[in-house]
Amino acid sequence: MSDVDAFLASMLPRLQTADTALHNGDASARVALWSHHDPVTLFGAVVATTGWEKIGATFDWLASRFSNCTAFAYEVLAAGVSGDLAYIVGVEHTTASIGDDPPADYVLRVTTIFRREEGEWRVVHRHGDPYDASSADVARRLDA
């Protein structure tokens, strides 16, 4: 198994679990995936911020807005590993409720960068933006 295959085999199930939980109102699995050692950055579809303290608070806020995740899938477009750094470029397909609304589909283009810390891969950067106009509408509702 190549380094990239081993990395993806380890991280994709954890990303799936963390993002499904976040979209069901629980940020704890996503918090556990992230490095708590600066520098860390988040360029989200709704919020952009830097520093673990602000990012952790952003995850709690996001979790408070989402519920009823009925589907989450991660489509990997590219991935790589070099020493203690790795990345995944992909498309996230999510169906979840925002507030009291019925579940809605949205799609994000996502780039995630990881750093190995004490033998564990931790997220240090995530950039996500809406894939299409309908996904942009969902992102706007999230920030309302």
Q: How should each PLM-predicted stretch be described?
A:
Residues 76, 83-85, 118:
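Residue-level signal for tight coil/turn positions that link beta-strands
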Residues 90-97:
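Generic short beta-strand segments
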Residues 107-137:
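Short beta-strand edge/turn micro-motifs at domain boundaries
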